[in-house]
Amino acid sequence: MSQRGNGVMETDARRLEIDRTRMAEDLRGVVAGDVIFDDAGRSLYSTDASLFRLPPLGVVRPRSVEDVAATLEWASRNGVPVHPRGAGTGLAGDALGSGVILDCSRHLRRIIRTADETVCVQPGVTCRQLEAHLAAVGRCFGPDPANAAVTTLGGMIGRNTSGSRFPLYGAVRDRIVSAEVVLSDGTVTELRPTAVTNWGNAEGLTADAARRATLARGIAAVHGAAQDELASWAASGRLVHGGYRLDGVVCPPISDGAATLIDLPRLLAGSSGSLAVVTTVTLKTRPTVAGAAVGLFFFDSLERAAAAALRLQPLVPAACDLFDKRHLALSRSASPTFERLIPALAEAGLLVEFAGDDQAGCQRQLDDAVELMRRSRFHCIDVRRAEVAADVELFWQLSRTVVSTLHGVRGTVRPVQFMEDVVIPPGQLPAFLERYQDVLKRHSATALLYAHAGHGQLHVRPFADPRRSGERERLEALAADLVGEVVRLDGTIGGEQGLGLSRTRFFAEHFPGQVSVCREIKRLFDPAGLLNPGKIVPAAAESRPAWRQLPQTFPESVGLPLLNWTPEALAAEVDACNGCGACRADAGPLRMCPRFRESPGEEWSPRAKANLVAGLLGGEVDPQAAGMEAARAIADTCFNCHQCRVDCAAGVDIPALVTELKAAVVAAEGLRWTPWLLARVDRLSALGGRLRPLSNWALTNPQARWLLERLLGIAQGRRLPRFTGNAFLRWAARRGLTRPSRRAGPRVLFFLDTFARRHDPLVARSLVALLERSGVGVFIDPRQVASGIAAISVGDLDLARRLARRNLRVLTEAVRLGYEIIATEPAAVTAIQHDYPLLLDDEELPRVVAATRHATDYLWELQQEGRLVGGFEPLPQRLLYHQPCHLRQHGGGQRTAGLLRLIPNLSLDTRPTGCSGMAGTFGLDHDHYRTSLRIGRTLLTAVREPELTGGVTECSACRLQMEQATSKQTLHPVVLLAIAAGLAPKDALSGDNLRPATAAGRVATVPAAEG
């Protein structure tokens, strides 16, 4: 019976696979955009920022309104649900479903036109993109979600986003003028305010106008039939939030003989894409606010802070956010700046902003607020003020990083995104807090609370372990109890995060009359119920979506982990990714993710890798060859820059997860020729050194470079460094540096990288000279080999482990003898500190890791101790400093800049230039060459500026990129220091260790950015 059952299950699985294949083929026949129905691709869309995991049938990423219409027409004919999706950063599961995901964030990203008071955009444009665009003309949109860098306008419309500045700007529904939409049957129509006239007469109307008139008539009828329900709601004084909102949609005649006006586009706000799919939207804009002043008020209790928020409302603040003590404590621990800013004894805080066109007026309002707090009995224990733009922005980081700060809580018990977004009348805030504490006590729970206190929007996150048995039931009981208290205080749910999978049932339970009205509106727009079913209006056969938790045991066929960690540790790292989507930022202060910024598709995002590993571990993705081919394509979108690990608030080790993925792909399918070759770039460099001058001639010969590209896959257009052989080690041996030093005092083992050893020995000789002149003994063990970072980056674990073992023997001996380990190559430090512990199980590794640092960090320590060689001569140069990704993850860069500023007359430009795009051997590969240049566009453009005489960076790969499109020299910082100290020849400033890609010396141009 069991075998028969298994056979039936296998047959069903094959049938489903056949059906999916047929569906994908059908859609590819009518859609120009991306159609993704493979297991690996589907797994990326099985989560958002909520607790749920729900694999879709497939994914369509439309390129045009025609693609959207074709998809919905196909879905209507086949009875397949469609779930519109933006960035997938919602906390309620709005973007999840078992049908076809319609991802509008990949291609629909254009700002179409800007008028005096409006702007027309596609739904994939992010809030930050729009605001940056409008700021250039002195305008703004207004609603400001905390994750504005990643939240799309489509998602903001779906959730009716407001943000902290709701009192100043209102919500999205207040800003919509009109929208081009596709209805569930594939019909394209424009929704705009429509007069209800000639209801029964469609003669003379276009099809679009007739459809619009039908919808307007239907809404008017629903509104008329729901008068009792709407009147009852209004009489209660209850705030209107979740669901389809009719307030402000039906506008009565303004004069005798005038028609009732139905504001159809206003209905879209808060609809979670369940009425229509927006393809373009016209939004109102307003002038930017010229002045702002912010106060941070700290209190000795949450209750007093809440009472103070109410007392401040007559002053009409633009924003008033409330933080509890747990959030303040997390913020203090996450940032030294906030540690200084927030008093250790503060139990609660208020961020209060006054904004207007007059800066002096804003400051006077803040003065009034401070005086009010001092005269009142709210026990305000401290106040911080911000009245200049930089300080205002710093204070706002406390509010904007609320969610990301919570993500920094690691461990099984952490604040979970399950009962966010309840809304109460602001005057009820003190009463709610009392009941909130009672609810927590009844359920023996702890929670974190954050609120837009000025307009009554509250976000509650209980501490829980979603993997614990019975935890879901406990949280659901807690949520039900809390929602009950909210309703009793005339509150509601779904303020700015929608109802989604997590709150729709609570909405139906407490507000059945409202749900009946919503059901009629849904039937009018989407008769078949195929658009995002189960959101706002409960589905007929409502299922209970699974939480995104990994099974206790994994299928043996998965074969993971391949790195040196337990299955439990691997699962915990995957589980640490909460799907917040911050790694999808396409601009701003964070550097993650360079690949996503160049190609903004979900598979390029760091969180996609965590989702893919989760799919493998959970059995959703076939680990055999068929599944691994798609997995390879996703894993290859990461080039191991580690910026996600630096910038992720939760500190998820995505590079380690990607190494697991790539290793699994290599185990299943082997390594392709060019990656295999580039993993052994040190051997290639050694061979080139032995064959010089022939090899150096080949670097400049167009025919030879063409042949190299065809045979080896190394990009013909890439400028490559000359080969110098093993000259440095021979020089070091003559100096006695290849034997351990017996001298007293500090001693270092210099860990050589490929570039300094085989291409530019001046870097190595400069470091040795600086160290020796500073009284530091130097040892260069000739047994050391390449760090293995190139092999790690492509998933060649066999080679990486062999190299790591050989190096570990050398490094362990040195550490035992009291040596510290330094390297001039940041990626080599990454390999030792981050990757070797994942490759090898050796008790000596922690000591080796602790003893390893970058050369410039070590030199900075010497400078701080007064032991670094001094007397630097002036160098009249203006150089662009580029901070390498691998140095940034070690906290370096500022120390390098500090060292270089010791050189008189050296002007250093330290502007942020992002990732260079070279990424080790990534930019050498013909397949990635143009992508590499696009990623490095900002850096390449900067270094070309005529006032700059050259560049400086610690990373040899970044150096290659900086010299790719200019004749200017880029040097390692230690070379500049050695020149200024008289320890290296000054002609190195004008030298050129690179050969042009062709004999004609043609300079490569940067290709246009995608999209």
Language model features with spans:
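N-terminal flexible segment immediately upstream of the FAD-binding catalytic core
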Residues: 1-73, 77, 87-117, 146, ...
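N-terminal glycine-rich flavin-associated loop
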Residues: 15, 27, 50-82, 104-147, ...
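C-terminal substrate-recognition/cap domain of FAD-linked oxidoreductases
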Residues: 37-45, 250-253, 260-261, 265-477, ...
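A gly/ser-rich beta-alpha-beta helix-loop segment of oxidoreductase catalytic cores
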Residues: 51, 91-92, 128, 134-178, ...
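Long hydrophobic segments that form regular secondary structure
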Residues: 251-275, 297-315, 429-439, 559-652, ...
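Terminal amphipathic helices with adjacent charged low-complexity linkers/tails
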Residues: 314-413, 447, 451, 537, ...
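Ferredoxin-type iron-sulfur electron-transfer modules and their immediate structural context
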Residues: 488-492, 500-502, 507-637, 655-670, ...
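Iron-sulfur cluster-binding electron-transfer modules in prokaryotic oxidoreductases
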Residues: 526, 533, 547, 655-1011
